[in-house]
From Swiss-Prot:
This is Glucosamine-6-phosphate deaminase. It comes from Caenorhabditis elegans. One of its GO terms (cellular component) is cytoplasm. It is an enzyme of class 3 (hydrolase). The active site is at D71 (proton acceptor), D140 (for ring-opening step), H142 (proton acceptor), E147 (for ring-opening step). The keyword Hydrolase applies.
Length: 267
């Protein structure tokens, strides 16, 4: 496991975007597609903006990229401004040269949620598995919609959202919790664990306790991202504020490796 510590959220976004570009170019040079798992929410927005900048500068093409998003609300119209389908197209897909046929987002409006989730897992497998799964975490350490108490062996399924998550997401619905969907389709913890690499973005002091629990405490279903401790190639990228709850020696150790880590994303 690696922990990358950057000064602020902008530098977290820069490092993450450069890493994604590096992986895409490596795959393309070998005549392969790169399969990406992608998140929504406020944390990855900076990364998407940087990736668009790299695309506009001619540094990267997304023609050889396939994507699978982490989650989608149930019974929220696809064209709703707060659907994750709208989020991804408004903030990323519409601005790059990705083939729409290579974009995969769960359909929360299907009449058969179980079948949709099974098909999603099948499509991931047919694509050769996810090469790099990018994710964010909630203040309670949840990844995707795998909230506290979720099975660490879980796969894509329908989840009922807890009150904390609904309240946290109310800001996207004008502060009205009655407008927030109460269920979502989400990849499972094991779905993420199956990826060849996982990259978790954490910014802000409100995520500091979650980062501490994720990397300095034991693995627990009450902090689902802690399962990444068992992943063969997991990287956490955090800003200084997100490290406030970490031990001094933990921060010192990983900062001592930063020159090496930065050399991996130089282009």
């Amino acid at each position: 496991m690696k922990l990358i510590i950057e000064e602020n959220a902008d530098k977290v976004a820069e490092f993450a975007a450069r890493y994604v570009v590096t992986k895409i170019n490596e795959a393309t040079e070998n005549g392969k597609y790169l399969v990406l798992g992608l998140p929504t929410g406020s944390t990855p927005l900076g990364m998407y903006k940087k990736l668009i900048e790299f695309y506009n500068a001619g540094v990267i093409s997304f023609e050889k990229v396939k994507t699978f998003n982490m989650d989608e609300y149930v019974d929220l119209p696809r064209d709703h401004t707060e659907s994750y389908h709208s989020f991804m197209f408004d903030n990323f897909f519409r601005h790059i040269d990705i083939n729409p046929a290579n974009i995969h987002i769960l359909d929360g409006n299907t009449s058969d949620h179980e079948k949709e989730c099974e098909e999603y897992e099948r499509k991931i497998k047919e694509s050769g598995g996810i090469d790099l799964f990018v994710g964010g975490i909630g203040p309670d350490g949840h990844i995707a919609f795998n909230e506290p108490g979720s099975s660490l062996a879980s796969r894509t399924r329908i989840k009922t959202l807890n009150e904390d998550t609904i309240q946290a997401n109310a800001r996207f619905f004008g502060g009205d919790i009655t407008k927030v969907p109460t269920q979502a389709l989400t990849v499972g913890v094991q779905t993420v664990m199956d990826a060849r690499e996982v990259m978790i973005l954490i910014t802000g002091s409100h995520k500091a306790l979650a980062l501490h629990q994720a990397i300095e405490c034991g693995i627990s279903h009450m902090c689902t991202v802690s399962a990444m401790q068992m992943h063969r190639c997991a990287t956490f990228i955090a800003d200084e504020d997100a490290t406030l709850e970490l031990k001094v020696k933990t921060v010192k150790y990983f900062k001592g490796l930063m020159n090496h880590h930065r050399s991996l994303v130089m282009f």
